[in-house]
A protein has these predicted regions:
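Acidic helix-start/capping segments at beta-turn-to-alpha-helix junctions
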Residues: 54-74, 162-169, 200-209, 213, ...
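A metal-dependent hydrolase signature that marks the N-terminal structural subdomain at the beginning
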Residues: 28-100
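Short pre-active-site segment immediately N-terminal to the catalytic Zn-binding motif
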Residues: 125-142, 173
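Post-HExxH zinc-binding segment in Zn-dependent metallohydrolases
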Residues: 40, 151-203
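C-terminal soluble interaction/assembly domains
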Residues: 338-438
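Bacterial N-terminal signal peptides
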Residues: 11-22
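Pan-zinc metallopeptidase signature
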Residues: 42, 213-349, 357
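Catalytic zinc-binding patch centered on the HExxH motif and its immediate surroundings
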Residues: 67-81, 101-125
Length: 438
């Protein structure tokens, strides 16, 4: 679950800003050499083949001031009820602890990592002033200037405004487009300047140990979800760039990716392969009076892969290579994804019902996920499913029952307080599948 939806405001990639920690030095005082900043902005626009920014008026903050500003931005945008529901869904699947303080975790994560950010609502381009303007700061500025260019020429504001009614998977895909674009642009900017690249290497080498304490203790769905747009998004945008130059990247803003599957497999984006819309039965009648739906969303291929990977905090990131690395089995089991949808229902107190259906590209792909998810559930609950048939399983849990079923290209998973409730909802899911297959 990409449960902190406003990460788009913080535009420097986590990997880069982890490298920023302690890596300042050399150059003139940041904020005192506007000509140097304007040069970076002009060269970035030329490289990106877009008109230069209308006016460069960056805001310079110390790290302490930036941490205060970041916290204020997060608190302003925080949807307490929506986030609470998302946490409950994520906890149901074992992705986060039920008691997690997600707001504070995000404040700490971004305070630890941010090197700068662009706020599309105010137009502020913020550069964190850690001492001097050197190669690393030029890298960050190039990234942030790209966001200004996106806002002025490519409809970034409209792209972000259109996220309100999207699933988390769709949001993560869109963020991967514009953060991948900004990341690739800043990489190419440094690569175009051999002296700057050497200075950047020297700055990083002199930076000492990287501070990743918060990242290393965060649930992987949070930490890897934060870096996915920058790392995997860069690979996606690079593929577009290699296929059709910056014109192909620009065109993606008018037809943005709609799933993390398309980010992970650029060929599927280029082929126009869209996720399947998955319908769920109305569970209210089965659950009874007083129950209400509090979360309706989509996992998507990336988050399913993270789920199946079942990583310890801090795992999954190869910071030397700048890539997300999940176990092959988890990635393979998620790779046949074709669509999914889940809902979380509550009785207003502690009782919950979770309904999740996923559709796969073939019956074989569905079975691969079914077996992988079964193994994941049995491992985390330290209990085995029971069944009379290998494709229709039951797991007794404290405070409820889980049902897992495979039918053709569809996998259904239901958790409810009673066996009758779980069975009836699963029967409705299976009936819907049979109607679709008929």
């Amino acid at each position: 679950m990409q449960i902190a939806r406003r990460w788009f405001r913080l535009a420097s990639p986590l990997l880069l800003t982890l490298l920023l920690t302690g890596a300042g030095g050399g150059g003139t005082a940041l904020g005192q050499d506007l000509a140097a900043l304007e040069e970076v902005a002009a060269e970035t626009a030329a490289l990106r083949e877009l008109p230069p920014v209308a006016a460069l008026d960056p805001v310079f903050l110390t790290r302490e001031e930036a941490e205060v500003a970041i916290e204020a931005l997060l608190r302003e945008e925080w949807d307490e009820d929506g986030i609470a529901a998302a946490i409950r869904s994520a906890a149901t699947l074992g992705l986060v602890p039920a008691e997690i303080n997600l707001l504070q975790l995000n404040i700490d994560l971004l305070g630890e990592s941010a090197g700068g950010y662009y706020d599309p609502e105010t137009g502020n381009l913020v550069v964190i002033q850690d001492g001097s303007f050197g190669a690393l700061e030029a890298y960050v500025l190039s990234h942030e200037v790209t966001h200004v260019l996106q806002a002025e020429h490519l409809g970034l504001d409209e792209l972000i405004d259109g996220m309100d009614d999207l699933t988390d998977d769709e949001i993560l895909a869109r963020v991967a487009l514009y953060e991948g674009d900004a990341s690739l642009t800043s990489i190419l900017y440094v690569a175009s300047k051999p002296v700057l690249a050497l200075q950047l290497g020297a700055q990083l080498a002199a930076g000492g140990d990287l501070e990743t304490a918060v990242f290393d203790t965060a649930p992987p769905v949070i930490s890897l979800g934060l870096v996915f747009p920058y790392l995997t998004g860069t690979t996606f945008v690079q593929s577009l760039y290699e296929d059709g130059g910056w014109a192909a990247v620009d065109a993606a803003y008018a037809s943005p990716p709609t799933s993390t599957e398309q980010i992970l497999h650029t060929d599927k984006y280029l082929a126009g392969e869209e996720p399947v819309d998955v319908a769920l039965p109305e569970a209210a009648a089965t659950l009874g009076a007083g129950w209400e739906e509090i979360d309706d969303n989509r996992m998507g291929e990336f988050q399913i892969a993270v789920l199946l990977a079942d990583l310890d905090p801090g795992a999954g990131l190869n910071d030397l290579m700048g890539t997300i690395e999940l176990p092959d089995a988890a990635s393979a089991a998620a790779a046949g994804w074709d669509g999914d949808r889940y809902q979380l229902w509550t009785d207003g107190e502690d009782a919950e019902a979770f309904v999740w259906a996923s559709v796969w590209e073939s019956d074989a792909e569905a079975e691969e996920f079914f077996l992988a998810f079964r193994a994941y559930e049995e491992a985390r609950h330290d209990a085995g499913f029971t069944s009379e048939r290998p494709d229709d399983l039951t797991l007794e849990l404290d405070g409820g029952v889980a049902r897992l079923a495979l039918a053709g290209d569809t996998v259904s998973y239901v958790r409810a307080p009673t066996a009758d409730q779980a069975n009836q909802i699963l029967d409705e899911l299976m009936s819907d599948h049979l109607e679709k297959a008929a």
